[in-house]
Regions:
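Conserved C-terminal helix/tail region of periplasmic/extracytoplasmic solute-binding proteins
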Residues: 243, 351-382
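Mature extracytoplasmic/periplasmic domains
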Residues: 290, 295-356
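A ligand-binding cleft/hinge motif common to bilobed small-molecule-binding domains
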Residues: 101-104, 252-272
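Extracytoplasmic ligand-binding site segments that recognize negatively charged/polar headgroups
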Residues: 96, 102-232, 239-246
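Early extracytoplasmic/lumenal segment of secretory-pathway proteins
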Residues: 37-108
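Periplasmic-binding protein-like
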Residues: 219-228, 234, 272-293
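Short beta-strand->loop
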Residues: 112-123, 270-286, 295-298
């Protein structure tokens, strides 16, 4: 794929984070310069990650410390990534993958078991998060948890309360899924992620149905609900909401915590100083964990393990948490995360809130197709 920063800035959606040019340029300038012809080639590692989903200095620091040349490519959505890995011969050593994708990747023989003897920094990982990951990765054999987060509601507090009043249900999915509220909020713009594996489970959960339902009839009910809301949604997109929330083009989004945090920072940088807030609805919301995995056909497995071990260092992963406003899975890194991030309940939920969260899970292929058709119907409004 092209790694021209000027092109990438506008052509690749973000998982959840910054869109400022300085970060992009610093990220993609790392490790891409060719070695001098008269110098022996350095060992290398090829990384495949979400766009701008790592601290901007991490790759350069790793190269300096490890003496390993790094090539860093990005993907725009998990379907693209999964398809490339399933096809084989991707050329990547380490990939960042969502927990709900792990079972299919493991079953297909795409992933390589991690050699823990080469990962001394594994000891820093949080046992509770490792235990939760075992539903998708038994015995934590294949995945080293990286960052985690939730999918909830981002909103402009001033605009929402001016429209719905001081008692606006900002801590409930009613803000979006109750049509009378959404119709009123449409005057200032409401957007949703373009993510069937997150939005459809939320709709099912809101209806009191299993979020990971295997019943096709449940998806008809979710589709009916979402189609009622469709006329009031300005667009479905997983990156545009960040700039639009920052500049006031929208006032509500069903989105990610880190994206809303970035919108607030962008707003302040532009001098808008909007009162942007992220909330985890009291009814419950999806929680996801992104992990570092190694491919079975990785061309540089030793260098891949060196990179994973580097990312498991508390000081290293804390930099990404501080940059992205996402919690990490490293129990010894928490104290290194900025206090204002740790104190944000939308980023670091309380135990009571954590108990309401539900994990994204893989579905049987037949039901996955039903969910995809449901989502496509909702997006087109047909």
């Amino acid at each position: 794929m092209s790694l021209d920063p000027a092109l990438m800035l506008w052509s690749i959606p973000m998982k959840s984070t910054r869109y400022m040019q300085f970060a992009l340029v610093s990220l993609f300038s790392v490790g891409l310069a060719c070695a001098k012809a008269d110098e022996p080639a350095k060992p290398s590692v090829h990384i495949y990650n979400w766009y701008d989903y790592i601290a901007p200095n991490t790759m350069s620091d790793f190269q300096k410390e490890a003496g390993i040349s790094a090539v860093y490519d990005v993907f725009d959505n998990s379907d693209v990534m999964q398809s490339k890995l399933m096809a084989g011969r991707s050329g990547y050593d380490v990939v960042v993958a969502s927990g709900d994708l792990l079972p299919n990747l493991i079953k297909a023989g795409v992933l390589k078991k991690l050699d823990r003897s080469k990962l001394p920094n594994w000891s820093h990982l949080d046992p509770e998060i490792l235990a939760k990951l075992q539903s998708n990765d038994p015995a934590n054999s294949y995945a080293a948890p990286y960052l985690w987060g939730t999918t909830g509601i981002g909103y402009d507090a001033d605009k929402v309360k001016s429209i719905l009043g001081p008692d606006a249900p900002v801590n409930s999915w009613d803000l979006i899924f109750k049509e009378e509220n959404l119709a009123k909020l449409s005057q200032c713009g409401v957007a949703m992620l373009d993510a069937a594996n997150e939005v459809v489970p939320i709709a099912l959960h809101y209806l009191g149905l299993p979020y990971n339902s295997r019943n096709p009839d449940d998806y008809k009910k979710a589709q009916e609900l979402l189609l009622k809301l469709r006329p009031h949604i300005v667009y479905f997109d997983s990156s545009k909401f960040i700039s639009d929330l920052a500049n006031g083009n929208i006032c509500v989004v069903l989105g990610w915590a880190g994206g809303v945090a970035d919108a607030q920072k962008a707003s302040e940088l532009a001098g808008n100083h909007r009162n942007l807030v992220y909330s985890i609805p009291r009814e419950g919301a999806p929680v996801w964990v992104e992990s570092l995995v190694q491919l079975n056909d990785a061309p540089n497995p030793e260098q891949g393990l060196a990179f994973i071990n580097y990312m498991l260092r508390p000081d290293v992963i804390a930099e990404s948490s501080n940059y992205l406003s996402y919690p990490n899975a490293n129990k010894d890194a928490t104290a290194l995360v900025e206090q204002k991030i740790r104190d944000n309940p939308g980023v670091y939920p309380s135990k009571d809130v954590l108990d309401t969260l539900f994990p994204l899970e893989p579905l049987p292929l037949k039901i996955e197709r039903v969910r995809t058709r449901t989502w496509n119907t909702v997006k087109t409004g047909a």
